[in-house]
Amino acid sequence: MSEFWLISAPGDKENLQALERMNSVTSKSNLSHNTKFAIPDFKVGTLDSLVGLSDELGKLDTFAESLIKRMAQSVVEVMEDSKGKVHENLLANGVDLTSFVTHFEWDMAKYPAKQPLVSVVDTLAKQLAQIETDLKSRTAAYSVLKANLENLEKKSTGNLFTRTLSDIVSKEDFVLDSEYLITLLVIVPKSSYVQWQKTYESLSDMVVPRSTKLIAEDNEGGLFTVTLFRKVIEDFKVKAKENKFIVREFYYDEKEIKREREEMTRLLSDKKQQYQTSCVALKKGSATYRDHKVKVTPLGNPTRPTAGQNDRESEGEGEGPLLRWLKVNFSEAFIAWIHIKALRVFVESVLRYGLPVNFQAVLLQPHKKSATKRLREVLNSVFRHLDEVAAASILDASVEIPGLQLSNQDYFPYVYFHIDLSLLD
């Protein structure tokens, strides 16, 4: 499953034993895989400031999740024919999202734990806001390009009445630069081809004999040329319409046709060069990604290999700027999101369990959807004794307190936050 439960309990002896009981029961019943989730010690500040931060982090959490989902959807749209390999391009620091979450380690260089919590939150908020601003401008430019290209493509795929003729006609099909003569294009139903050949010369005076030629056709009819004197154009149109032959308003302009063809070529080239897709992950250790060391301490299984032993290495090739930007900044936004989750656990744990700071965070990955109800029952049973501590801290679980974001629906004896990696659902 791509679902995780991030919980915490007080770090005293009694509750550490409760965590071990939880791990034992969930392991034997095959309910979940549990991993310690390391969160650094931060400067706590006042409890009032923590309540405010709790509210701000809740909003930032929602914003970050929405942002990475939008970015994931943008990757889908850009990759077009390679949509089946989208997940290979949705990585965090060069590894798949599940590996990053289960091997999470706080980035001290980017978000120093020695800074006040409010500064760390502000850094995360500004980073995500900038990514969203850039996402809007880049995807807007892509949408304009795509729309312009689709409009030109529609003109090339319609019927003979509406489609562009620049890719059908040629200079040789027309009498040009004549003071007296002009070549018209006439759409003739397929059932009337024979009638057209027999009557077009007599539809009006001054029609050049044997001047008609079929130059294109679709399922409904054909496009014929006919040359006549300019002064009988209107008369010819009227007589043609009476016979269900439609004169297409088109006059050969070599410069305009050249411009239209060049525009199509330019748009196709822009889309290919600027937004070309690749299903290969960015090369590990490139300037784009900082090497990320990962470390994990699984409960009851200290010999489990670390993520570094399974790092993926592949070299990106043929990536256009938009896809490359999306991959890099999706990674940055996702990493920021998991850091926000860690901060929420820290802040909520201090508000719940009090000072001095002493709690243990654990990441649970339910093995299957059908087991989540049983897993919740196990957790509620193991940590039932925390109700008294929580009640003393939050006064009344049935009353929503600004910042704590608790209610009857989502209140549990332990700190709990949900992480869902189903970003494309």
From Swiss-Prot:
Top-level division of the source organism's lineage: Eukaryota
Keyword Ion transport in record: yes
GO-annotated cellular components: vacuolar proton-transporting V-type ATPase, V1 domain
PANTHER family named among the record's database cross-references: V-TYPE PROTON ATPASE SUBUNIT C, V-TYPE PROTON ATPASE SUBUNIT C 2
Protein name per the record: V-type proton ATPase subunit C 2
Function: Subunit of the V1 complex of vacuolar(H+)-ATPase (V-ATPase), a multisubunit enzyme composed of a peripheral complex (V1) that hydrolyzes ATP and a membrane integral complex (V0) that translocates protons. V-ATPase is responsible for acidifying and maintaining the pH of intracellular compartments and in some cell types, is targeted to the plasma membrane, where it is responsible for acidifying the extracellular environment. Subunit C is necessary for the assembly of the catalytic sector of the enzyme and is likely to have a specific function in its catalytic activity.
Pfam families linked to this entry: V-ATPase_C
Keywords noted in UniProt: Hydrogen ion transport, Ion transport, Transport
The family this protein is said to belong to: Belongs to the V-ATPase C subunit family.
Region ranges (Disordered): 295-318
KW Transport (keyword) present: yes
Tissue expression profile of the protein: Lung, kidney and testis. Expressed in both bronchiolar and alveolar lung epithelial cells. Isoform 1 is predominantly expressed in the lung while isoform 2 is strongly expressed in the kidney and testis.
Alphabetical GO biological process terms: positive regulation of Wnt signaling pathway
Any GO MF annotation of the entry: proton-transporting ATPase activity, rotational mechanism
Organism of this sequence: Rattus norvegicus (Rat)
Subunit structure: V-ATPase is a heteromultimeric enzyme made up of two complexes: the ATP-hydrolytic V1 complex and the proton translocation V0 complex. The V1 complex consists of three catalytic AB heterodimers that form a heterohexamer, three peripheral stalks each consisting of EG heterodimers, one central rotor including subunits D and F, and the regulatory subunits C and H. The proton translocation complex V0 consists of the proton transport subunit a, a ring of proteolipid subunits c9c'', rotary subunit d, subunits e and f, and the accessory subunits ATP6AP1/Ac45 and ATP6AP2/PRR.
